[in-house]
Amino acid sequence: MSEFEVNDFGEVVSNAEEMSGAELYADFLGKVEKPKDEFVYYYSKYLSVVNRLTGAATKLHFWLSLNSEVNTGRVFVQSMTQRGALDELKMTVGTYYKALNQLKELGLIKGESAVYYINPAYIWKGTADMRARFLKVYPRL
């Protein structure tokens, strides 16, 4: 059974218990210590895309990544959350949707309406071992 499944609502969920980064990277790096905290990782591939983003799209992408679920990259943007984001990012509704469309067009996020997924090839919030497992199961997210 995979550590990730798609539930009845089309959401990617993790059913993994304890994960060990050392299992995945032992052949390549030797012993790898698991970080004590969760991090938001920005991968070098992201640099090739970030220069093409507008300032609003960059701010929105950072906001979405920081507010995404750990180890899934899923972000819920309900109307209350959207209003909070607009206030926090100092954006108009029109600017928000233009930025959102640019993120989708460049493949940085996927999703519709209130549920989006951060593309783990660029940014990942969580542990590196869960990202590796996620990319193995969903290589084209």
Features from the language model and the residues they span:
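Short recognition helix of helix-turn-helix/winged-helix DNA-binding domains
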Residues: 1-77
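Intrinsically disordered, low-complexity segments enriched in small/polar residues
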Residues: 23, 39-41, 94, 114-115, ...
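N-terminal start-of-chain detector that recognizes signal peptides
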Residues: 30-35, 47-49, 82, 87-91, ...
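Winged helix-turn-helix DNA-binding recognition segment
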Residues: 51, 67-124
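Short, amphipathic alpha-helical interaction segments positioned at domain boundaries
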Residues: 124-141
